[in-house]
Regions:
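Bacterial N-terminal signal peptides that target proteins for export
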Residues: 2-15
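Segments that shape or occlude catalytic/ligand-binding pockets
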Residues: 28-278
């Protein structure tokens, strides 16, 4: 009888423990919230990383490259205030900068020239502000003066980049001497793309057309055609204590207008603001 009592106590204790475990598990594995996870909304507009740090990094890159090319260490780079990229080469450099030599220097082919440009971009990418695989050559021309020009567009995002940024121009002589270099590419674009990919447009294509037509007071004869979503880069509003606070990236609808006072409108796809017209 005593043994039976002990067995019943053990069974009761086991049952109590099992019940406690089941209740605890139910408390941990709550049903999913039908409204989705409760988290803070992503920051918007998406700002470029601290431009001050970027300017310091670019200044160091210029110093290192200028030493490699025999340029005086006292020469300072002309850096873009918003992107920290090389806006122009300093005037009156004490030494020349050349494209890398590819093929026969006396008779370079167009393929040789493009390969030399590619190698130059790889070497100067910290000042250019773009990864080589983000850049597409959109124009290669020769001016009447003999100066050769190569123009590139930066295409780092899922959507096209607008706002006048993401451009690289290299000017050089037939012997490969660089006479001009200008970039306003977006540095660290991969980090920005990660943030942009989390955005879901809050304005539909049809709503964008309606908003543009109403806000621009377009005539009935005007034709409004939404083209595509784009990433629009524009200077952020700087605090009074600073000359600039870098760039902001916005997801926007690019809308073409025919027979109207403007030809193109950029409507923020998140905030429903008109951010630019052309």
């Amino acid at each position: 009888m005593f043994a039976g009592l002990q067995i019943r106590k053990v069974l009761a204790l086991t049952l109590a423990c099992a019940t406690l475990l089941i209740v605890s598990a139910c408390a941990v594995f709550q049903p999913a919230d039908p409204n989705g996870p409760r988290s803070n909304a992503p920051q918007y507009p998406i700002g470029l990383s601290d431009v001050g740090t970027r300017l310091e990094e670019a200044s160091l890159a210029w110093y290192q490259l200028s030493q490699r090319y025999g340029v005086s260490g006292k020469t300072e780079a002309n850096l873009h205030p918003y992107t920290g990229t090389l806006e122009s080469l300093p005037a009156n450099l004490p030494a020349s900068i050349h494209l890398p030599k590819v093929g026969d220097p006396s008779k370079p082919t167009e393929a040789d020239t493009r390969e030399a440009l590619r190698r130059f971009i790889v070497e100067w990418q910290r000042l250019i502000g773009a990864e080589p695989d983000e850049l597409s050559l959109v124009e290669r021309t020769d001016e009447p003066t003999g100066i050769k020009v190569a123009r590139y567009e930066q295409r780092p995002f899922r959507y096209p980049l607008r706002g006048g940024f993401g451009n690289l121009t290299i000017r050089f002589r037939s012997d490969g001497q660089i006479v001009g270099l200008s970039s306003n590419c977006i540095p660290n674009a991969d980090r920005l793309q990660a943030a942009l990919s989390n955005l879901t447009p809050q304005v539909t294509r049809e709503q964008a057309v309606e908003q543009v037509r109403n806000r621009q007071n377009l005539a009935a004869t005007a034709v409004v055609e939404p083209q595509q979503l784009v990433v629009y880069a524009q200077p952020a509003k700087a605090p009074q204590s600073a000359p600039t606070s870098g760039l902001e990236m916005r997801l926007a609808w690019e809308v073409n207008v025919t027979n109207g006072p403007v030809t193109k409108v950029y409507l923020d796809a998140m905030s429903n603001e008109i951010i630019a017209t052309l």
